[in-house]
Regions:
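Active-site glycine-rich loops that stabilize anionic/oxyanionic intermediates
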Residues: 61, 68-73, 274-275
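Short beta-strand/loop motif that positions the catalytic acidic residue
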Residues: 194-196, 200
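Cap/lid segment of the alpha/beta-hydrolase catalytic domain
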Residues: 98-123
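Alpha/beta-hydrolase active-site loop
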Residues: 116-139, 160
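Bacterial N-terminal signal peptides
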Residues: 4-15
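A fold-wide structural signal in alpha/beta-hydrolase
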Residues: 91-96, 191
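Structural cue for short, hydrophobic secondary-structure segments
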Residues: 66-69, 96, 270
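A domain-start/cap signature at the N-terminus of enzymes
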Residues: 19-63, 75-81, 86, 120-125, ...
Length: 311
């Protein structure tokens, strides 16, 4: 009898208890700039989102991840790249994540760091995966058209994402950044657009000849490009063309290795005399070298990205 009464009381209490509300869904994002935060490995991670002016939440929208260079962060990448303007014009969502480090000067765990620079590095591949999951709760993302571009260390991170997150990244466009990981084993062919200045003094074009910075172990530009030509099964004989005009201050060549598996390709754009810069944008400081004014990295990237989506 006592057991029956106890059971009855528990049942009555459960019935009278207020129902638990389901977890609140995040509010969808509208056009404009937004900041999102995530917890990863005990660290608070942030990323900025720019939703373009013409965004329609009923229509799946492409996403471009813009990864900053070393000693930078997401907000710095906004003005460094100028991709927000391109986002509004072309209609894609642009995301500016921040790496990890001390204060505002952050880096990506793209591989390649040696000595103390290699200690305690975050799992940034997992972070980008979680970021995309979170973004999908507030923006109508076209999962077949998620792209990554990046400057310097951010460009190196693009190569790592192509190798280790190829099931979610449709194509990559590293600028002034080469392969920093030992081995690349993508699950699928990933189209690559690599942009580099021939006079880059920070990530030199010919690093394969022993010119890497003392705290990093990197591949050279040609070695990075050829790695992905082979991984994608592209034609060994490329098509080369001049995309600058006669009389331009800097000559810009585009070399395309086409015919890759699943429609993939590898494209190398070289700015003759260009430094460690983002073509089409003024360099913030003089010592990083000259930037091309006659071509736009943002235009080249978007033209390239539009040709490729996950299949």
């Amino acid at each position: 009898m006592r057991t029956s009464l106890t059971t009855l009381l528990i049942g009555l209490l459960a019935a009278s208890a207020p129902a638990q509300d389901p977890p609140k869904q995040p509010d969808p994002l509208g056009p404009g700039d937004h900041t999102r935060t995530l917890m990863m490995g005990g660290l608070k991670r942030t990323y900025l989102v720019h939703v373009p002016k013409g965004y329609d939440p009923k229509t799946p929208t492409p996403v471009v991840l813009a990864l900053h260079g070393a000693a930078m962060n997401g907000p710095m990448m906004v003005w460094f790249s100028g991709l927000t303007t391109k986002s509004d014009a072309a209609g894609f969502v642009v995301v500016y994540p921040s790496g990890t480090g001390t204060g505002p000067f952050l880096t990506w765990n793209a591989g390649g760091f040696t000595g103390k620079m290699a200690e305690g590095k975050a799992d940034d591949v997992a972070f980008i995966g979680k970021l995309l999951d979170d973004l999908g709760t507030v923006v109508t993302v076209d999962g077949k058209r998620v792209y990554a571009c990046g400057m310097s260390n951010g460009g190196m991170m693009c190569y790592r994402l192509a190798a280790e997150l190829s099931d979610r990244i449709a194509a990559v466009a590293p600028v002034a950044g080469t392969i920093a990981i030992e081995e690349s084993k993508p699950k699928r062919p990933v189209p690559v657009l690599h942009i580099h200045g021939s006079k880059d003094g920070i990530v030199p074009f010919e690093m394969a000849k022993g010119k890497s910075p003392p705290f990093m172990k990197l591949k050279g530009v040609e070695e990075s490009v050829q790695t992905w030509v082979k991984l994608n099964g592209c034609d060994e004989k490329p098509k080369a063309e001049m995309i600058s005009k006669d009389g331009d201050e800097m000559k810009v060549t585009r070399t395309t290795y086409g015919g890759g598996k699943a429609g993939s390709e590898v494209v190398l754009v070289v700015v003759e005399g260009g430094g460690h810069t983002w073509p089409g944008r003024e360099p913030p400081v003089g010592f990083i070298g000259k930037s091309a004014r006659n071509v736009s990295a943002n235009d080249l990237m978007w033209e390239f990205f539009q040709k490729h989506k996950l299949k």
